[in-house]
Amino acid sequence: MHAIGLMSGTSLDGVDAAVIETDGERVFGTGRSATLFYEDGLRARLRALLDAAPGLAPDDPELLSLDWLLADRHAEAVAMVASRADVVGFHGQTILHDPDRRRTWQIGDAAHLAHKTRLPVVHDFRSADVAAGGQGAPLAPLFHAALAEALEKPLLVVNIGGVANITWLGPTGEVLACDTGPGNGPLDDWVRLHTGAAFDADGALAAAGRVDQARLTRLMDDPWFARPAPKSLDRLQFSARVAAATEGLSAADGAALLVAFTAAAIAAAPLPAPPRRVLVAGGGRHNAAIMDALRRHFAAPVEPVEAVGWDGDALEAQCFGFLAVRALRGLPLSLPETTGVPAPLAGGRIVRPGPAAE
């Protein structure tokens, strides 16, 4: 089947769209990909909604407005990769993720998206897992396993978006996955606050700073890091701790500390065996300071996923195209080893377009 996957991450920068050909078990090919960047006003509205999400009512007028608007933006992203497609995999925009209270909330009107694209839309990928006691994240490991079938193991795939997560793939088919801690999220927020830029381009600001090891130790001294995998977190989970640890630092030293925090948290993830290779996806792979920090932690080569021919900018969107096909076939989206769900579990909900308007 040909699927179009859509992913809008917690960095709130836009929506990625990508075409993938798959049966939900193997990847036969990939097609066009594109990113539709959100305008500044939409990013600001989403950031405010994310901050308000714990107390938000489902009928909140701003929520309903953004629910519709996000579907419009995602339909525009589909048009950017316009291709023969059988289904759309629509992750939606996460505004709340609290699996310990069995809550996860992704917004975006899937029915409106189905109407706009005239395609079946699979959405709500995480709720079934969370309701069953799983962490609801990460969901990429089965896709990573399909892509990496021919690669040497053990292999570690690291995705650094707003949150960082890993997939560890063993030599006899073992899979382990979890969120590791903050990704680009705290660093982006820091850079925006102190320089006005959207992110630390090439890691230049962090590279100019010095890491205060005592502050880094305090950041890593959080009970969450002692929890066994699988585990997941919300983008804002460490906000108070980060604010306290960075207080009084220069822009460069704060950026350096947050880069070190991201890398140290990834390296602290409990792995069954050391990887022979570390492949990095997500926006973090463009940050030279993060990549250098990871190389100091791992004995294995640390490379962007492009080193094995994967498209790091399209990978997450491709993943949700892959998962959409799995959902259509009733195949599991999560495993005990990836989200902590008690048994392999299917998920996602399907919305089909109604009759076209006259």
Swiss-Prot record:
Transmembrane regions: none
InterPro entries with a match to the protein in the record: Anhydro_N_Ac-Mur_kinase, ATPase_NBD
Keyword Aminoacyl-tRNA synthetase set for record: no
GO MF entry, a single one: phosphotransferase activity, alcohol group as acceptor
The enzyme's E.C. designation: 2.7.1.170
Chain positions recorded as ATP binding sites: G9, T10, S11, L12, D13, G14, V15, D16
Enzyme class: transferase
SUPFAM superfamilies in the record: Actin-like ATPase domain (SSF53067)
This protein's pathway: Amino-sugar metabolism; 1,6-anhydro-N-acetylmuramate degradation; Cell wall biogenesis; peptidoglycan recycling
Catalytic reactions of this protein: 1,6-anhydro-N-acetyl-beta-muramate + ATP + H2O = N-acetyl-D-muramate 6-phosphate + ADP + H(+)
Top-level lineage group: Bacteria
Job description of the protein: Catalyzes the specific phosphorylation of 1,6-anhydro-N-acetylmuramic acid (anhMurNAc) with the simultaneous cleavage of the 1,6-anhydro ring, generating MurNAc-6-P. Is required for the utilization of anhMurNAc either imported from the medium or derived from its own cell wall murein, and thus plays a role in cell wall recycling.
NCBIfam families the UniProt entry points to: PRK09585.1-5 (NF007141)
The family this protein is said to belong to: Belongs to the anhydro-N-acetylmuramic acid kinase family.
HAMAP family, per the entry: AnhMurNAc_kinase
Protein known as: Anhydro-N-acetylmuramic acid kinase
Gene (UniProt): anmK
